[in-house]
Amino acid sequence: MGHKVHPTGIRLGISKDWNSKWYANKGDFAAYLAADLKVREMLRKKLAQAGVSKILIERPAKTARVTIHTARPGVVIGKRGEDIEKLRKEVSELMGVPAHINVTEVRKPELDAQLVAESIAQQLERRIMFRRAMKRSVGNAMRLGALGIKVNVAGRLNGAEIARSEWYREGRVPLHTLRADIDYGFAEASTTYGIIGIKVWIYKGEVFDFSQVGQEKQDDSPRNDRNDRGDRGDRPSRPAREAR
């Protein structure tokens, strides 16, 4: 049976960028990687209600810069910046260097695959029918400009004895096209019957300027050059051929 490669991993360096950007010597690499994992785990646990999409980590010149992409920046910052200052101190302790935290707002959470997956997971935990949750998320994404979306849920759906998977797709989701800007997200819903996994793929267009991922989209409409040639009366007359 065929298996799908991770859509982000296969596009790293082509149309996707890394979530951690730093260089380490051979002896420091493991410590840096472990610190990144601890920071991400801590932030996602403390900001579970803030709608965190992704966390970017950079280490420039013995400092650390953490960028949090969230749908609710007010929850992250807190009153007068108190909450974000506490987070900054905890991040500095985990990473062992002075840290700076930047907060970036996700303008359209309906087009962010990770936030869509977490939204479906929360609905399943509230005992909402999985088909209704899937179709609602698909409809919202297509309404806000997505070119395609696919949602897959797997587990004991509706409390069935035998686990199964169901998926729903609308539009195009070209996983084999490396220049396609495909956002991927995964979340788990903890229900009384067990864990239900949710995977979401969102196709936003094709990337041509890789320095600005997702900024430019390809025009998928078919070209019809004949319509742009004008009337026959507007064309210059061809010169007559000389007789041989």
Curated annotation (Swiss-Prot):
* The entry's keywords: Ribonucleoprotein, Ribosomal protein, RNA-binding, rRNA-binding
Molecular function per GO: mRNA binding; rRNA binding; structural constituent of ribosome
Q: Where is the KH type-2 domain?
A: 39-107
Bias class Basic and acidic residues marks the residues at: 216-244
Is Ribonucleoprotein included in the keywords of this UniProt record?
Answer: yes
SMART domains assigned: KH
* Pfam families per the UniProt record, alphabetical: KH_2, Ribosomal_S3_C
- For the region Disordered, what residue ranges are annotated? 213-244
Q: State how it assembles.
A: Part of the 30S ribosomal subunit. Forms a tight complex with proteins S10 and S14.
What role does it play? Binds the lower part of the 30S subunit head. Binds mRNA in the 70S ribosome, positioning it for translation.
Q: Know the name of this protein?
A: Small ribosomal subunit protein uS3
Gene that this sequence comes from: rpsC
